């Protein structure tokens, strides 16, 4: 093999090595690009996932706030409705209280009412001796009906006529005005056992309060259909 052949063979080997090196370099480049694209895609997907999670979190927060605000508005509306209902019911009660002031105006009917209240109180107490308290302006009415009230009680309870002492301490007078906040009494009596352990309040105001509480569910049902 002469020098020319040797030189050609060397050049051929160099070309082969260069080609192999270029192919390897190309493979490395392609592989690196593929890995880069994969990592880039993974980063993009991770960022997308992060953005979706953040959006979902904020959307949930907005939904929760919206539900809270709706609940607060609904509760506020309910409170307003309940307050309006209470105002109407209280206005009815106040109107009834004003009507009570007219009861004692008819002396004849009021005396009969006082007698019924006294008999009812005696039947409730069932005591041989009781203390009766009334308004100062009603004292003469009480004295006029007291004897017949004691007799009626004795007949109904089948007992002797009880001793009834009219107290010198009086119930508060009728209110001086409709919007008065002072202690007042529209009429009726308060009776108690002599030792004061048993007390029966049978004033017009107390009877109205009892009747109103008893009828309140029915009143609300008729007014508000609930």
UniProtKB/Swiss-Prot annotation:
GO MF, one example: proton-transporting ATPase activity, rotational mechanism
SUPFAM superfamilies registered for this protein in UniProt: V-type ATPase subunit E-like
Cellular component terms (Gene Ontology): proton-transporting two-sector ATPase complex, catalytic domain
Statement: the UniProt record of this protein carries the keyword Ion transport: yes
Alphabetical list of PANTHER family matching this protein: ATPASE H+-TRANSPORTING V1 SUBUNIT E1A-RELATED
Similarity annotation: Belongs to the V-ATPase E subunit family.
Purpose: Subunit of the peripheral V1 complex of vacuolar ATPase essential for assembly or catalytic function. V-ATPase is responsible for acidifying a variety of intracellular compartments in eukaryotic cells.
Protein name per its UniProtKB record: V-type proton ATPase subunit E
Gene designation: VATE
